[in-house]
Amino acid sequence: MTDSFYISTAISYTNGSPHIGHAYEVIAADVIARFKRLDGYDVFFLTGTDEHGLKVQQKAKELGINPKDYVDKVSKEFIELAKSLNCSNNDFIRTTDDRHKKNVHSIWKNLSDKGDIYLDQYSGWYSIRDEAFYNEEELVKSDNDSYLSPNGNPVEWIDEESYFFKLSKYEKQLLDLYEKNKSFILPNSRMNEIKNFVQSGLKDISISRKNISWGIPVEENNEHSIYVWLDALTNYISALDWCEGSKSFDKYWPADIHLIGKDITRFHAVYWPAFLFSAGLEVPKMIFSHGFLLNKGEKISKSVGNTVDPIKLLELYGVDQLRFYLLSATPFGNDGNYSHELIVNHSNALLSNDLGNLSQRCLKMIFSKCNGRIPNKGDLDDNDLSLLSNAYDLYQKSLECMADYQIHAYLNSIFDVISLANKYFSDQKPWELDKDNPDRMHTVLWVTCEILRITSILLQPVIVDGSNKLLAVSYTHLRAHETLRYLVCRLLR
């Protein structure tokens, strides 16, 4: 039976068009999904859009259109972005989908039946931009002495009737989860932040807003809409038709990884597992909280106004180049920088100069000297064996790197071997061997092609089009190059 693997992105909020930060997250998830498929897993990859809440309601009103018409338009932009980025998501969930609403009502009922929901009065600070409630000690002072959320967004005082969830009830269970599963939240720095937050004492949280029209209504009290985070987080099980008792839910849940931005770690690592504990469901295996993509050192966000249109970047650089830069230039999990100069220099150095140069020099000789067919190898000398050994080690190195989702390290190890192969090719000078030692020339070309084959297989999750084209040119007679299983078979020969 094939092992399953479930990966999700955070669903993108539809208060504006996609920016490069959204592209970064969905590309990263796609790379992981594609790698797992290469390794033989049955992968379910989910992304989608979060379409309810006061921000969306206000934006639609500002534009003079119906909220549903507005989110239909913006959601389509996110769907098209994923396609343009060559993403292989199995599903795209929308919180306005009927299937999602059914699951939200079901999880609310489970929480209520457990005695974990009660009606009370909420008095406190709320950020419309964050769609989040905050305690006063969490707020920061602005230059003019007004309060801001931890993300630097405006907050307002609200005093209204609200349904509450007994988050405080699950404090010990959450701390036990973090203690028993050290990799539940990665990177480790985020785990420490969350543990400190929970250890400081949890308060019950508001899970509804009153008199907000754009949301999923509480079934027993239509004056209330279900708070956007309980609504939004449920998407991960809605896509699997949890409330219908589906086979998909049995197969893929619990999720192997929720891939999210670091600014929403608390919602995923505290509130979501607490909701699941209450509902009697398993928690996800891991929350990977990646850093921000920075525009010249500044966080890219709609509120700051420094967003970058990813579609324009695709037109300027190409999809493989953008995917490669975003995932290789910065250790995954850390904040990363974007600029035109960085993308061009990075892509030129590694894709054009290293991989492109090696493949062009090798394949050109094969077509001119070997009638376009990869030659048979002769006896292998120490130089050949050393390079091949480094290449064959890549399979295990890649598995080790991707086990912790260190995508940059996985790519660096591949390009280290490509760099060695370029030096090998230059040192061996196969173009000088044609007349005096054609057997040796054939061996050098065979070894170089073997490096290109191995690295192209391993690069497929990131450089989707380019690596497949290279494999198609070099190995048109092979149909098994699409999986790592074929790589292993060749290594064991």
Task: Give the role of each language-model region.
Residues 2-47, 99-103, 148-368, 410-414:
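Structured secondary-structure scaffolds
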Residues 417, 442-461:
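An amphipathic alpha-helical micro-motif enriched in hydrophobic residues
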